[in-house]
Curated annotation (Swiss-Prot):
Pathway: Pyrimidine metabolism; UMP biosynthesis via de novo pathway; UMP from orotate: step 1/2. Keywords: Glycosyltransferase, Magnesium, Pyrimidine biosynthesis, Transferase. CDD domains: PRTases_typeI. Its EC number is 2.4.2.10. One of its GO terms (molecular function) is magnesium ion binding. The keyword RNA-binding does not apply. Belongs to the purine/pyrimidine phosphoribosyltransferase family. PyrE subfamily. Homodimer. This is Orotate phosphoribosyltransferase. The keyword Zinc does not apply. Catalyzes the transfer of a ribosyl phosphate group from 5-phosphoribose 1-diphosphate to orotate, leading to the formation of orotidine monophosphate (OMP). NCBIfam families: pyrE. GO terms for cellular component: cytoplasm.
C-alpha cells in the first residue's frame, strides 16, 4: 500500500466526502461510514481528486489508450483525470456519453474522442455495476476494447451473493478494477489514527458481517 491511498482518505474526510457515524446504505444495511464523491464539487477538490485518480491509474499498470466517463458523474472525472495524466506525461483522449441521444448537431450518445483501442472506464464507485455494464456495451459497439475500471473507493462488501460488486465485474468481464482506496485502506487509517478510534470496532464488525476478501 502506498501513502497516496491514506492521503486520499484523509482528504476525503477533510472534504466531508467520507464520514463516520451511523448511516443506512441503499441496500438497507446499517453502515458505520458513508462515502459521497458528489461532494468533490469545487475546482480545488476536483483538481486534487483527479491527481489521486491519475496516480492510482498509473500505479495500477493497466494498459489503456483513452478514458471513458459514464454520464453523469464520470464526465467530469474523465476530463479532469485526462488533464492530470497529461501533466504526468500520459496524454490520452477521453469521451463520455449522454443519457439521451441527440438527433441534431453531433448526434448520438457519445461525446468527445472516438472510442478506439483499449478504453479505461472511470467512475466514482461500483454499486450494482449497471454503469459499468452499460459502458462496456457502448465501448464494444464502437469496436473498441474495455481495458478496466478506475474508481475512487472499493467498499469490499458483498452484493446479493458472496461476491462484491467489484469482484462481480472482474469475474464477469475479466476486467481489472483499480480503486484509489479500499475498505482495507480505511481500516488501516482507523488503526493508525487514534482520533478515529471509536469507529474502529464498528467498521471491523461491519467488515466481518458484509466484507469480502
Amino acid at each position: 500500500m502506498t501513502d497516496f491511498r491514506q492521503d486520499f482518505l484523509k482528504f476525503s474526510l477533510a472534504q466531508n466526502v467520507l464520514k463516520f457515524g451511523e448511516f443506512t446504505t441503499k441496500a438497507g444495511r446499517r453502515s458505520p461510514y458513508f462515502f459521497n464523491a458528489g461532494l468533490f464539487n469545487d475546482g480545488a477538490s476536483t483538481l486534487q481528486l483527479a491527481k489521486f485518480y491519475a496516480q492510482s491509474i498509473i500505479e495500477s499498470g493497466i494498459r489503456f489508450d483513452m478514458l471513458f466517463g459514464p454520464a453523469y458523474k464520470g464526465i467530469i472525472l474523465a476530463a479532469a483525470t485526462a488533464m492530470m495524466l497529461a501533466e504526468k506525461g500520459v496524454n490520452v483522449p477521453f469521451a463520455y456519453n449522454r443519457k439521451e441521444a441527440k438527433d441534431h448537431g453531433e448526434g448520438g450518445v457519445l461525446v468527445g474522442a472516438p472510442l478506439k483501442g483499449r478504453v479505461l472506464i472511470i467512475d466514482d464507485v461500483i454499486s450494482a455495476g449497471t454503469s459499468v455494464r452499460e459502458s462496456i456495451k457502448l465501448i464494444e459497439a464502437e469496436g473498441a476494447t474495455p481495458a478496466g475500471v478506475a474508481i475512487a473507493l472499493d467498499r469490499m462488501e458483498k452484493g446479493t451473493g458472496e461476491l462484491s460488486a467489484v469482484q462481480e465485474v472482474e469475474k464477469q468481464y475479466g476486467l481489472p478494477v483499480a480503486p484509489i482506496a479500499s475498505l482495507n485502506d480505511l481500516f488501516i487509517l482507523l488503526q493508525n489514527n487514534p482520533e478515529f478510534g471509536q469507529f474502529l470496532e464498528p467498521v471491523r464488525a461491519y467488515r466481518r458481517q458484509y466484507g469480502v476478501e
